[in-house]
Swiss-Prot record:
Compartment(s): Mitochondrion inner membrane
Record organism: Heterololigo bleekeri (Spear squid)
Binding site for heme b b566: 98, 197
Protein name per UniProt: Cytochrome b
InterPro entries according to UniProt: Cyt_b/b6_C, Cyt_b/b6_C_sf, Cyt_b/b6_N, Cytb/b6-like_sf, Cytochrome_b, Cytochrome_b_C_euk/bac, Cytochrome_b_N_euk/bac, Di-haem_cyt_TM
Assembly notes: The main subunits of complex b-c1 are: cytochrome b, cytochrome c1 and the Rieske protein.
Length: 379
């Protein structure tokens, strides 16, 4: 009876097609688990954020104190806050693994799914950025001031747009209120985009480690992959809880323990660790407008991967040159993250400039490496 119900009920039929009887390639590896882990991260963030929003006050006089109130007076408020703060870091770790897997195995050939995924990456970054201002600490305040002020680099209308974002002539009460509003709203936009991402993925079918058409050898998602995903859920939740209990402030900034003060500038203004690679590219360009364009293009370059693809080559699994290119990209990412947290002085500034050129270079040379590999195979 249950079997017939899930196949006949209008709502359960959709769920059944998406999660139970979904045909999936037989050879998916553990790297395909990060998609479901991202869904879990989104649920954890929405639920913990919902309870935090019940006790938070989006007013400059009370924002910092309301966070202290959550930590000290609300039952298990400290757990909620640390889970939410470190959950964002785990979200980005899973997100970067998910993108890296897509690049390595050539998932960008599924163009609609890939492009919606890149839009999702921008939305997650935007959500995390507006949330960073909410504790109203020193680094939150100055980070938001510096990053939003970059919009003034837009010719003609830039300064006016900055004032519109701020709601005045500086980051103040209006800015905090609208950032809180956006931080509450954007996760629901994210959910809608995730459904679209899911929809397009099921239209084309999932990629697989071999990069070939897997229609001849598919298995149902449940029970083969559902239990595998559940194991990933338990491992990630265990790591998140353990990290939040033992090292709750390891990924935060000590400046945020000081209430925001517009008269005192921190020694080194920097965003959260998951933005540091893009921030390092921004700082490497002497021109303000050039830096902003480079910042945006450091992620927008992912949109161009389907167009840089050469037919006949898919992913890096069997292409030695593309494997070297991929691991060079990963090395650049980690080094840029390190440079983004260093002061703007020699030799860090010079290293950042070299790494910025390399970051864009590894994407631009991809078609030539594909052609070289095809030439070697034909030879």
């Amino acid at each position: 009876m249950l079997s017939s119900l899930r196949k006949s009920h209008p709502v359960l039929k959709i769920v059944n097609g998406a999660l139970v009887d979904l045909p999936v390639p037989v050879n998916l590896s553990v790297w395909w688990n990060f998609g479901s882990l991202l869904g879990l991260c989104l649920i954890v963030q929405v639920l913990s954020g919902l309870f935090l929003a019940m006790h938070y006050t989006s007013c400059v006089e009370m924002a910092f104190d309301s966070v202290v109130h959550i930590m000290r007076d609300v039952n298990y408020g400290w757990v909620l806050r640390y889970i939410h703060a470190n959950g964002a870091s785990f979200f980005f770790i899973c997100l970067y693994f998910h993108v890296a897997r897509g690049i390595y195995y050539g998932s960008y050939v599924l163009m609609e799914t890939w492009n919606i995924g890149v839009v999702l990456l921008f939305l997650v970054m935007g959500t995390a950025f507006v949330g960073y201002l909410l504790p109203w600490g020193q680094m939150s305040f100055w980070g938001a001031t510096v990053i939003t002020n970059l919009v003034s680099a837009i010719p003609y209308v830039g300064e006016m747009v900055v004032y519109w974002i701020w709601g005045g002539f500086s980051v103040d009460n209006a800015t905090l209120s609208r950032f809180f509003c956006f931080h509450f709203l954007l996760p629901f936009v994210l959910m809608a985009m995730v459904v679209m991402h899911f929809l397009f993925l099921h239209q084309t079918g999932s990629n697989n480690p071999l990069g070939i058409n897997g229609n001849l050898d598919k298995i149902p998602f449940h029970q083969y992959y559902s239990y595998k995903d559940l194991l990933g859920f338990f491992v990630m939740l265990l790591l998140l809880i353990e990290f939040s209990m033992l090292f709750p402030n390891a990924l935060g900034d000590s400046e945020n323990f000081i209430p925001a003060n517009s008269l005192v500038t921190p020694l080194h203004i920097k965003p959260e660790w998951y933005f540091l690679f893009a921030y390092a590219i921004l700082r490497s360009i002497p021109s303000k407008l050039g830096g902003v364009i480079s910042l945006v293009m450091s992620i927008c370059v992912l949109f161009f991967l389907p167009f840089l693809h050469i037919k006949g080559c898919r992913g890096c699994s069997y292409n030695v040159f593309m494997q070297l290119n991929f691991w060079l990209m990963i090395g650049c990412f980690f080094l840029l993250t390190w440079i983004g947290g260093c002061p703007v002085e020699y030799p860090y500034e010079f290293i950042g400039q070299v790494l910025s050129v390399m970051w864009f270079g590894v994407f631009l040379v991809r078609p030539f490496l594909d052609l070289l590999w095809l030439y070697i195979l034909d030879y």
